[in-house]
């Protein structure tokens, strides 16, 4: 399995499985001299971790991060930073009864066909549990981007099912378990999630991530355009099935005369392109929307096949999120931060300035 790393200069390599001993990652390319402690990473990990509310997975993981290397006297040294999280609430026995079945909508079938072997315990490497290490690495990038360039990254739930959440109050995002920016929609979302849990079903979602105060110049045309690398990184998040930058698919219904982000001496008049032009950051706020499919592991029986190719009916037990889009918010923020950090260092290496 060769696809465990992302980035060229700021490079993140993760390892570990959902119900294995631990999760870990190596972060290369962190500039020396950055004040960094475990709590800097723990804040975002707590936003992602399961068991934090009755609306997400009941798996109770503390996700306590350990920094194993790359820090001396509280500062980064420029060497590889090793990070580790032990799995404390793994329950592989939950999957014993379905180990010979391919859960519909999961990676079980494709992993088995590709590798001839798979870790059936919660999907193993294919589980979203792996993303804990992306969040830890992303927290390092976020800290550097903010402290050195005042770049702010914010994500939020913009739609769940038919409930649309407008960006009304930034403070509201962290004040509810759904990362919802509209205080008037929180109760409605809670009722939806409770109804889904009662029925044993799940729902899809759309999340939005933003970056403010970006300099002009991030992105390496033609194949490493900023939006191309963002698509690569964000589409690697479990359950993400769609992505749009700025107006995205809405451009289909627009005229060129009304959507070209005209400029004046005062700056851009609009930001339909979401802060990226020609694959390079324009200095405007970067705006990306992600669509996530509903959780496939639900209590409603479904048809599938076993390893012998026979049609069977199965019900998935275990501890699963009724909407994976909720906990995907800090994951998407982290992947955005990782890509921006890598492109910032690449730009500085080639051009030497902003």
UniProtKB/Swiss-Prot annotation:
The keyword Amino-acid biosynthesis applies. FMN binds at residues 125-127, 238-239, 278, 293-297, 319. Pfam families: Chorismate_synt (PF01264). Reduced FMN (FMNH(2)). It catalyses: 5-O-(1-carboxyvinyl)-3-phosphoshikimate = chorismate + phosphate. It comes from the Bacteria. Keywords: Amino-acid biosynthesis, Aromatic amino acid biosynthesis, FAD, Flavoprotein, FMN, Lyase, NADP. Gene3D superfamilies: Chorismate synthase AroC. Homotetramer. PANTHER family: CHORISMATE SYNTHASE. This is Chorismate synthase. It comes from Hamiltonella defensa subsp. Acyrthosiphon pisum (strain 5AT).
């Amino acid at each position: 399995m060769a696809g465990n790393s992302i980035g060229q200069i700021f490079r993140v390599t993760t390892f570990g499985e959902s119900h294995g001993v631990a999760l870990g990652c190596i972060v290369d390319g962190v500039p020396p001299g950055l004040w960094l402690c475990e709590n800097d990473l723990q804040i975002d990990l707590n936003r992602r971790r399961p068991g934090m509310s009755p609306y997400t997975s009941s798996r109770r993981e503390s996700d306590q991060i350990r920094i194993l290397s790359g820090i001396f006297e509280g500062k980064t040294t420029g060497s590889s930073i090793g990070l580790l999280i032990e799995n404390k609430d793994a329950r592989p026995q939950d999957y014993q009864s379905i180990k010979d079945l391919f859960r519909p909508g999961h990676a079980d079938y494709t992993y088995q066909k590709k590798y001839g072997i798979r870790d059936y315990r919660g999907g193993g490497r294919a589980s979203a549990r792996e993303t804990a290490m992306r969040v830890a690495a992303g927290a390092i990038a976020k800290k550097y981007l903010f402290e050195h360039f005042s770049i702010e990254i914010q994500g939020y739930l913009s739609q769940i099912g038919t409930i649309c959440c407008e960006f009304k109050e930034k403070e509201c995002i962290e004040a509810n378990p759904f990362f919802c920016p509209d205080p008037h929609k929180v109760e409605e979302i809670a009722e939806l999630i409770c109804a889904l849990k009662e029925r044993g079903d799940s729902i899809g979602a759309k999340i939005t991530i933003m970056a403010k105060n970006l300099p002009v110049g991030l992105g390496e045309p033609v194949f490493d355009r900023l939006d191309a690398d963002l698509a690569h990184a964000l589409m690697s998040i479990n359950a993400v099935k769609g992505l749009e930058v700025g107006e995205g698919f809405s451009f289909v219904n627009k005229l060129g005369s009304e959507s070209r982000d005209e400029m004046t001496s005062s700056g851009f008049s609009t930001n339909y392109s979401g802060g990226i032009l020609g694959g390079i950051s324009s200095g405007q706020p970067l705006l990306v929307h992600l669509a996530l499919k509903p959780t496939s592991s639900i209590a409603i029986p479904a048809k599938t096949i076993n390893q012998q190719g026979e049609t069977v009916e199965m019900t998935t037990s275990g501890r699963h999120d009724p909407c994976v889009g909720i906990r995907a918010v800090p994951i998407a923020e982290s992947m955005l931060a990782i890509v921006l950090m890598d492109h910032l260092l690449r730009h500085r290496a080639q051009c030497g300035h902003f």
